[in-house]
């Protein structure tokens, strides 16, 4: 066999192997030690979560994190070439270049930020916005150079203010960023509003109450997301303490939002609604509740009024959720801030093609004394680099 033909055959075999490897469902899970462990540890695990894989539930590799970072959430930029990791314990934002292997954490100093929570990136991939719940501000950053460029703050008694910001959503088509007012980190005070910013400038425009109860309602709006493909734009909001789901509709003429309640989790004996997730089409909405641990499925055909369809059991602390690429499986990370009673530590696996049947749970981290804080699917260009890497635990 000629060297050229041998090289061609080798390439074909390599591509075939890579293709098979890329069929895996790989996920990023940042985790920390459960309370009471003799040695505290934090890391990002890359795990195979495909129920049909021989490596189901196995950790394939890890990226160590500082043990005192208290890494919280993982977010991607628009083309998923970067991952950002927020931190509750230090005024740092970490970024990982997903196009380079091995993966390297780079710390971005954000000295004005205490208790970094959520991050969004502008549609042109040039600016990120980071909510800082402890310092009651939003940091705008250059998403190319990854440096902070502006600190946005506005204190009460101003009519428009930023207080304990947690959730954040962006819509560059209307030049707006919305942030929720959640809770003071020590839980001594609770917010009840959403604040609207001008995305291009960071100007604080307006603040809106998210509760039908008299103030102080202490509703704690926590997460906010724009419903995909909605025209005019619609946001959905979860209130952690009040246990409700809200919507906000953009009025193009008035250039403002109006907000109203669309669901109450109380009658279903659920509390602490947290994260939201949409399918690609945008006609399905998933909302997790930490107590006692459920995923609520809605028909989101009309995002102005999502219709509740079913509640699927997860585990205490049901928090972040991801869909498999074909949207057959739903994976729910069950842990909230290492809090007692709502930090199960597992990942619930749900088969949506079978009416929301719970197939079981991934207890890999839980069994080792860890709690996952977030789950995100690994971008495809990442997966190809793991075809020969197996450091299973």
Which role does the model predict for each range below?
Residues 8-18:
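Bacterial N-terminal signal peptides
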């Amino acid at each position: 066999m000629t060297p050229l033909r041998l090289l061609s055959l080798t390439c074909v075999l390599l591509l075939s192997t890579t293709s098979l490897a890329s069929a895996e469902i790989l996920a990023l899970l940042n985790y920390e030690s459960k309370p009471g462990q003799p040695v505290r540890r934090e890391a990002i695990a890359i795990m195979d979560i495909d129920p049909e894989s021989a490596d189901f539930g196995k950790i394939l590799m890890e990226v160590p994190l500082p043990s005192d970072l208290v890494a919280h959430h993982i977010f991607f930029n628009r083309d998923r070439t970067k991952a950002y990791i927020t931190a509750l314990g230090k005024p740092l934002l970490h970024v990982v270049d997903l196009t380079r292997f091995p993966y390297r954490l780079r710390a971005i100093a954000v000295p004005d930020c205490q208790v970094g929570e959520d991050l969004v990136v502008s549609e042109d991939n040039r600016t990120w916005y980071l909510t800082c719940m402890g310092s009651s501000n939003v940091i705008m950053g250059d998403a190319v150079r990854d440096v902070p460029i502006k600190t946005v703050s506005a204190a009460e008694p101003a009519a428009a203010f930023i207080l304990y910001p947690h959730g954040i959503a962006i819509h560059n088509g209307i030049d707006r960023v919305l942030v929720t007012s959640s809770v003071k980190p020590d839980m001594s005070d609770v917010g009840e509003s959403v604040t609207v910013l001008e995305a291009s400038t960071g100007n604080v425009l307006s603040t809106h109450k998210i509760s039908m109860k008299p103030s102080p309602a202490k509703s704690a709006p926590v997460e906010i997301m724009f419903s995909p493909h909605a025209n005019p734009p619609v946001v959905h909001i979860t209130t952690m303490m009040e246990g409700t789901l809200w919507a906000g509709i953009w009025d193009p003429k008035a250039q403002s939002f109006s907000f109203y309640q669309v669901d109450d989790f109380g009658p279903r004996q659920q509390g602490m609604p947290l994260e939201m997730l949409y399918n690609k089409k945008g006609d399905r909405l998933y909302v997790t509740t930490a107590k006692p641990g459920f995923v609520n499925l809605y028909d989101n055909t009309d995002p102005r009024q999502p219709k509740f369809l079913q509640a699927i059991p997860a585990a205490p602390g049901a928090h972040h959720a991801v869909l498999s690429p074909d949207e057959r499986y739903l994976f729910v990370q069950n842990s909230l801030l290492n809090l007692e009673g709502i930090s199960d530590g597992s990942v619930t696996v749900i088969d949506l093609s079978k009416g929301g049947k719970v197939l079981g749970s991934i207890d890999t981290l839980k069994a080792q004394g860890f709690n996952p804080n977030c789950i995100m699917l690994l971008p495809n260009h990442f997966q190809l680099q793991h075809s020969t890497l197996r450091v299973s635990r």
